[in-house]
């Protein structure tokens, strides 16, 4: 099989390209920009494009498939050439479905927790030596790539994003996967540039749930009021609601309770205890017992940038997290607050996504950082301009978060200076962003904060 990727540098795209290369396909690709880690990983597998940019001459009649990334535009010269030649053009969700249509597909949807739940299921299946294919949105410890496609696995576990499939396909990605077992972790309005109303956003999850066959399962979080109402409207498949798994915290370690037994975890937070229940029900649906699930989950360390410990001493700990939406922000701060009740909690987040930099959506952040002792918000005026959005002013952020002592920064150097000058005695720093605060190496910065005081 000969496959070409248009926009090979994307997170999901380059992982799919590597997965197909591992499978023995002949893989080529193009992009107008490729950064690390994608650049280094593509080079390692011998599929990094020789030249940056679009090259229509790479689109030849002998290609079996052209896979189109979201980064490419409708007028992309390679896409136009592929159409002209009548080649089979797939988005990466379409191609994943094509490769898994004869398998049991576990699709994890929801506004938050998708990556973690997907990672948990994959971890448990691997631990129990159950062959599975997968696509997950973050790097996992012990896994070389975020996508695996094989001819042997009977199950595929897919992180199902609700964002658009491709520039020429306006369907949400998770609709394309046709779930056998569908999980919805929660509904909190996002991607307002695509789903202009909350009702329109919720509708996408209902469509997803109604795609599940009669012999499948819908696993959904009943702690979420909107999801509870949605669940009551679903009659086409078996419904499995879940909530927070019973637990207790002792000496800074969270334990799962199962009758008389308890299991120590390497992760924490009520949101993760809900994620665990979702993963447990999915594994049950695939034939695993609770005991097999618990035996495996105790060694799960979490996905990259999901409450990931950067550095720690007896005095101070630094975590980084992907949290950026209001619901994720609140859940992540609350998790750290519960885990470290006697420490000063400094929460620092970046407004980075299209939605979060929109004045209308900003109002959703009211009281999201109330559980932190110190709250800081960073945004980049250049990012606002790049996204062609109206200018954001610090006063708008103060008003939106409804916190009088909120500290707002729009200069990365000043933010770093403020954090480095903070007294970190008996404290925890939580850095939250889907970006990197305009070029901060979060690992190095976290270590600097912890070990400069050691």
Residues covered by each model-derived region:
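Short pre-catalytic strand/loop immediately N-terminal to key active-site residues, enriched for Gly-Thr
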Residues: 263-268, 316-320
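Fold-independent oxyanion-binding glycine-rich loops
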Residues: 8-9, 30-31, 69-71, 92-93, ...
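Short N-terminal binding/cap micro-motifs at the start of the first secondary-structure element
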Residues: 12-15, 36-37, 142-143, 274
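Phosphate-binding loop of NTP-binding sites
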Residues: 19-23, 57-61, 70, 74-220, ...
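Short polybasic amphipathic segments
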Residues: 253-258
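Short, charged/polar "capping" segments at the starts of alpha-helices
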Residues: 34-39, 57-58, 73-76, 142-143, ...
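ATP-dependent carboxylate-amine ligase
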Residues: 1-34, 42-49, 62-66, 82-87, ...
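Beta-strand->loop->alpha-helix junctions that form or flank phosphate-binding loops
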Residues: 51-54, 90-97, 135-138, 234-251, ...
């Amino acid at each position: 099989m000969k496959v070409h990727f248009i926009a090979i540098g994307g997170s999901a795209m380059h992982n799919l390209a590597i997965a197909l290369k591992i499978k023995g396909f002949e893989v080529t690709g193009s992009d107008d920009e490729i950064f690390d880690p994608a650049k280094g990983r593509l080079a390692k597998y011998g599929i990094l494009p020789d030249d940056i940019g679009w090259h229509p001459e790479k689109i030849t009649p002998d290609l079996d498939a052209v896979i189109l990334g979201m980064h490419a535009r409708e007028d992309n010269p390679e896409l136009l050439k592929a159409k002209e030649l009548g080649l089979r053009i797939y988005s990466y969700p379409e191609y994943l479905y094509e490769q898994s249509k004869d398998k049991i597909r576990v699709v994890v949807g929801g506004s938050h927790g998708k990556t973690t739940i997907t990672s948990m299921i994959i971890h448990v299946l691997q631990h129990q030596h159950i062959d599975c294919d997968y696509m997950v949105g973050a790097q996992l410890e012990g896994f070389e790539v975020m996508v695996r496609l094989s001819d042997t696995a009977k199950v595929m576990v897919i992180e199902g994003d609700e964002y658009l499939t491709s520039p020429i396909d306006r369907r949400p990605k998770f609709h394309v996967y046709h779930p056998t077992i569908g999980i919805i972790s929660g509904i909190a309005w996002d991607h307002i540039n695509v789903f202009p109303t909350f009702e329109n956003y919720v509708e996408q999850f209902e469509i997803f749930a109604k795609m599940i066959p009669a012999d499948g399962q819908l696993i959904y979080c009943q702690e979420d009021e909107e999801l509870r109402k949605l669940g009551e409207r679903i009659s086409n498949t078996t419904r499995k609601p879940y909530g927070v798994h019973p637990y207790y915290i002792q000496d800074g370690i969270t334990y799962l309770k199962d009758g008389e037994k308890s299991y120590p975890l390497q992760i924490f937070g009520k949101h993760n205890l809900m994620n665990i229940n979702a993963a447990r029900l999915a594994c049950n649906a695939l034939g695993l017992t609770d005991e097999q699930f618990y035996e495996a989950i105790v060694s799960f360390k979490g996905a990259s940038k999901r409450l990931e410990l950067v550095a720690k001493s007896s005095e101070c700990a630094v975590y980084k997290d992907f949290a950026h939406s209001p619901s994720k922000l609140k859940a992540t701060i609350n998790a750290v607050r519960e885990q470290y009740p006697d420490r000063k909690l400094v929460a620092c987040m970046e407004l980075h996504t299209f939605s979060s930099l929109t004045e209308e959506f900003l109002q959703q952040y009211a009281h999201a950082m109330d559980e932190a002792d110190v709250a800081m918000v960073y945004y980049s005026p250049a990012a606002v301009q790049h996204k062609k959005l109206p200018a954001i002013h610090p006063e708008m952020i103060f008003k939106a978060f409804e916190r009088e002592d909120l500290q707002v920064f729009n200069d990365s150097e000043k933010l770093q200076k403020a954090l480095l000058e903070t007294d970190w005695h008996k404290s925890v720093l939580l850095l939250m962003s889907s970006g990197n605060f305009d070029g901060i190496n979060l690992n190095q910065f976290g270590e600097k904060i912890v070990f400069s005081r050691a």
